Amino acid sequence: MDRDQKKKELEQTKNEMRRKLEEYKERNRIMASKTTPTATTTSTLNTASTPSPPVAQEDFNSIMNSIDSMVPTQATPSSSSTISTSTHAESQKSNYIRPTLTIQSLVIEHDFPPKEIPMYSKGTQTMTDADTSNTNNTPELEAPNKNKTKYQLLQQQQQQQQQQQSSLNQDMQNLSIGTDSINGDGSSTSVANSANIDDDDKDEIEIPELDENEKKDILESDSFKSFFGRSSRVIERALCLDDSIDILVDYTISDENSKGTSKELKLLATLSDERWTKHRSITDISWSTKHPELVVSSYSANEAGSHDPDGVALVWSVNNYFQKPEYVFTCQSPVMTTFFSKFHSTLIVGGTYSGQIVIWDTRAEAKPVQKTPLSSVGHTHPVYSMAVVGSANANSLVSISTDAKLCSWNLENLSQPIETIELNSSNTNSANKAGGGGSGGGAPNMSIAVTSLVFPENELNHFYIGTEEGVICQAGRHGNRIVMNERYKGHFGPITSVDLHPSKGGADFSQYFLSSSTDWTCKLWSSKKETPLYSFEDYVDYVYDARWSPVHPSIFSTGDGSGTLSLWDLNQDLEAPIFRHKISNRSVNRLAWSHDGKRILVGDSGGSLSLFDSSEFSSPTSEEYSQFEDVMTKMVNKSRTSDSPLLGEGENQE
């Protein structure tokens, strides 16, 4: 009976376990259909290493409780019931049906989609119109898809500004309400009572009343009378004149600085360096022929004293004029002239006050890579002017100095000059021509102190020189002698610059040239006439430089000791410049036009380079060339009949 009872209980337990397992499986299927699977879970009934879901944990506990409540598979012998014989035990063991319970690991399978691999392309980075319409429903700011992020930021900024403005208005309103709520006895009313005040009834700012004496003083003041007179005239014009007439025209504006033209030079920037240009004067300016944005400028010694070298040459980029110099070159003597080599774009040539000629290389350090010896072989006086002549395959450097020497150099070897010619009356076959005037005057062996040198285009032997005596000479090299072909007399002070006309645009104006001097004048010359064609005398100080525009036939610029830049147009006016600009209180030492004529650099004695935009004067018309040709023809004809051939006063008196 006991055994049958145990069998029944075991069968009931097995059925109960099957039923609970079926319920457990059904419950898991329902949960799998309702939730999204995230990971594969394997639960083992006899292993507790992996945590199970909460619902599954409850089922496992119930199963384990059922197993614990089961009858043990093998009865434990008791002290009260002891089997006496082994045969009886073996028969009982053989007849005993041992129940078995197999529990397998419960495996839950989940299906996960494959991981999406991002592909970066224009399609994935650009939203469609449909996406934009779904994500951006705000009508205040509709932006292109490409700039969606930018416009969203702008939208956020607008919203923040609106919130700040609204909060500020609210604070101001609360402040005004709080102020109005204070009574005269110092007690304050509630904000609720003051909120009923209408906005139109807010207190206005009180304007102080003036007494009769104050009103009388204002009405009789000069400033009020001037203001009232101008205002009344404007009102009368508005009431009486036609609408097409400018009623605000000002008849007090002077046109002295822009006479005859509405064009002007525009200041772009000022190039200077605290260390290298302060207390130094600019001695020369030159634009690069290869890199149109580069310019080199030379400087004198530091007047305030410095541990830096006396000679400085700086290379600037006008495209980066807010930056420091591109290159800084130094030498032991002040640099009086400098320029980029015409056929070697990386070489910069400089002439010094000691007479040395130095060459810097932009590929090397700040010190010169070559220099001439300090001896009588080269120059012993300051070198104020030099030029590179020849072609790309055969060229030489020609230098001239106040020591009356003209030297030719090979740029690859400056140890000694190729040729040296003495400029004195005994070595020039026309020294006594035109007698006197500062170039010897018939005195034997008198040296010619040269301050400027210029070669015509494509010329190797013929050149123009300006002297300290105020005479301009057209000379030529013939062997070891200098032939003075012409002498141009008209200045009463040292020549500071000579500049030949560039002769572009199809017309030949190469015979005309400009000169400036310390006699406060700038003169226009023709190489075919020994006296000036015209003398420009609208100056109050030394004229240090005069330069033709490289593209416009009738325009040139001058700089004087008063710190003024003057722009002249011979087609418009011969008596006054069309534009005049005060650079500084320091003298204007050097000028340099860019090769395209769209910019001009002005250097002063304070060490500053002023960059001007001259593009308005860089596009001449064919009519302006014809007009300039007519002007010069009339000037030449009148100078021939002038009563005073020395100064050309016949033209100046017109």
Curated annotation (Swiss-Prot):
Region annotation Disordered: where it falls in the sequence: 1-59, 71-95, 116-144, 175-205
Ranges annotated as biased composition (Low complexity): 32-50, 76-87
The keyword Iron-sulfur appears for this protein: no
Any single Pfam family the record assigns to this protein: WD40
InterPro entries: DYNC1I1/DYNC1I2, Dynein_IC, WD40/YVTN_repeat-like_dom_sf, WD40_repeat_dom_sf, WD40_rpt
Biased composition (Basic and acidic residues): 1-29
Gene Ontology molecular function: dynactin binding; dynein heavy chain binding; dynein light chain binding; minus-end-directed microtubule motor activity
Covalent S-S links between cysteines: none
SMART domains in UniProt: WD40
Key words, A-Z: Coiled coil, Cytoplasm, Cytoskeleton, Dynein, Microtubule, Motor protein, Repeat, WD repeat
Record localization: Cytoplasm, Cytoskeleton
Alphabetical list of SUPFAM superfamilies matching this protein: WD40 repeat-like
GO BP of this protein: centrosome duplication; centrosome separation; Golgi localization; microtubule cytoskeleton organization; minus-end-directed vesicle transport along microtubule; transport along microtubule
GO CC annotations, alphabetized: centrosome; cytoplasmic dynein complex; early phagosome membrane; microtubule; phagolysosome membrane
Coiled coil (UniProt feature): 1-35
WD repeat ranges per the UniProt record: 277-326, 330-370, 378-419, 445-485, 490-535, 538-578, 583-622
Biased composition (Polar residues): 122-139, 175-196
Subunit relationships: Homodimer. The cytoplasmic dynein 1 complex consists of two catalytic heavy chains (HCs) and a number of non-catalytic subunits presented by intermediate chains (ICs), light intermediate chains (LICs) and light chains (LCs).
Function: Acts as one of several non-catalytic accessory components of the cytoplasmic dynein 1 complex that are thought to be involved in linking dynein to cargos and to adapter proteins that regulate dynein function. Cytoplasmic dynein 1 acts as a motor for the intracellular retrograde motility of vesicles and organelles along microtubules. The intermediate chain mediates the binding of dynein to dynactin.
Family membership: Belongs to the dynein intermediate chain family.
This protein's name: Cytoplasmic dynein 1 intermediate chain
Source organism of the structure: Dictyostelium discoideum (Social amoeba)
